[in-house]
Amino acid sequence: SIPSILGEEIGWRGLLVPELSKITSFTGVVLVSGILWSAFHWPLIFLGLYGNSDTSIYYQLFFFTLFITSTGTIMAYIRLKTDSVWTAVMYHGASNIFIQKVFTPITITNENSSYYIDEFGAVLALVATVVAFAYWRKGVKEFSSLAQKT
């Protein structure tokens, strides 16, 4: 939903990412913000309110954390590059729509589908990791002096 996306992005990319960029490298920014953003969702996964009940909780946590940290890397890059939280809000919203309303519904389901679809499966996490690696490399080069500004 728009209010929850906006709330998350104001907190994670609007406040946390710029503050972290004052004290650590781009690598530090993406690791800390990505893991914290993932951990923010973990209670809902543990309680069974968010996730995929067909796979183990450990599988869900691993791939969700990998996906969110990777996606957070891309969003931190665009946030710092544009100096605007709105780019992260738009990315987050588009990502949610694609995953929840397009990718998962059009996937042919079988007994193994739960292991590869949506935010809790392997496919999106692995694809996001490959894309995030490219953004991480760009970020390391472009924002090499982040923590040195203060």
Q: Which functions belong to the PLM regions below?
A:
Residues S1-R13, V17-I23, L47-Q60, T109, ...:
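Juxtamembrane helix-loop-helix connectors linking adjacent transmembrane helices
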Residues G7-L36, L80-S84:
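Membrane-interface helix/loop boundary segments of multi-pass membrane proteins
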Residues S25-V30, Q60, F64, I68, ...:
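Residue-level signature of transmembrane alpha-helical entry/exit and packing/kink sites
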Residues G34-S38, G93-N96:
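Residue-level recognition of pore/gate-forming positions within transmembrane alpha-helices
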Residues W37-L44, T71, M75, I99, ...:
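Alpha-helical transmembrane segments of multipass membrane proteins
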Residues S53-I117:
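Functionally important transmembrane alpha-helices
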Residues G93-T150:
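C-terminal membrane module of polytopic membrane proteins
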